[in-house]
């Protein structure tokens, strides 16, 4: 996922009794709602919204670390708020996530030199992202057990364009949507398993969907 070589901002149509076209609330909501890939900073947080432009996906920046995303019959998207540059910080989050099909809630990000895409998966929908991957170990953190995996993407979209790169995973065995994620615990466990991160690029509390529908409203700090 995630190639930002050609980004565009599109304001989507918003309809509803509480946000009628021409109303102040309508105009304010439209300013923050995205339907095409974009990154930026809003209310002190970095945000990243990437979509392959298949199906219907809309992302809305809320106040502070809050965001919402709605999707219907999507291809693939990843959306969320966090930090750029990232660090081994402790992430606290809460939210309401209602997927129908394949979707994840994760602490998600990238490093460079080497180019690594990483996930700390808190919950997933109909598909376990570790399916077919070899388990490299486990890490106990924040009241749960996470299984560690490594996978490879070949000629796939990345923050550096189409590249071949590794993906590092921690997948929580007991699902949750809300709590604290001590990322340092995962990064240290990955290193002990021979998984070397590079220099941090960005890291977000992400909602991802793949050929699915759903909605999510999340807040991160």
Curated annotation (Swiss-Prot):
Active-site residues from the entry: 117, 208
Entry function: Endo-1,4-beta-xylanase involved in the hydrolysis of xylan, a major structural heterogeneous polysaccharide found in plant biomass representing the second most abundant polysaccharide in the biosphere, after cellulose.
Pathway the protein contributes to: Glycan degradation; xylan degradation
GO biological process, one term: xylan catabolic process
Residues in GH11 domain copies: 33-221
Protein's recorded name: Probable endo-1,4-beta-xylanase B
GO cellular component: extracellular region
Organism: Aspergillus clavatus (strain ATCC 1007 / CBS 513.65 / DSM 816 / NCTC 3887 / NRRL 1 / QM 1276 / 107)
């Amino acid at each position: 996922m995630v190639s930002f070589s050609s980004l565009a901002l599109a304001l989507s149509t918003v309809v509803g009794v509480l946000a009628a076209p021409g109303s102040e609330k309508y105009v304010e909501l439209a300013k923050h709602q995205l339907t095409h890939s974009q990154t930026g900073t809003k209310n002190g947080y970095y945000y990243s919204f990437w979509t392959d432009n298949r199906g219907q996906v809309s992302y809305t920046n809320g106040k502070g670390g809050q965001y919402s995303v709605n999707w219907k019959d999507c291809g693939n998207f990843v959306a969320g708020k966090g930090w750029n540059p990232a660090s081994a910080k402790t992430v606290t989050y809460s939210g309401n996530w209602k997927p129908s099909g394949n979707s994840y809630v994760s602490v998600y990000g990238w490093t460079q030199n080497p180019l690594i895409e990483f996930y700390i998966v808190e919950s997933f929908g109909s598909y376990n992202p570790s399916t077919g991957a070899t388990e490299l170990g486990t890490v106990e953190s924040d009241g749960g057990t996470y299984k560690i995996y490594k996978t490879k993407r070949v000629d796939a979209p990345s923050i550096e364009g189409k590249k071949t790169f590794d993906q590092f995973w921690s997948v929580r065995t007991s699902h949750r949507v809300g709590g604290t994620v001590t990322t340092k615990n995962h990064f240290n466990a990955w290193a002990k398993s021979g998984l070397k991160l590079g220099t941090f690029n960005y890291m977000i509390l992400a909602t991802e969907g793949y050929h699915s529908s759903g909605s999510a409203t999340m807040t991160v700090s």
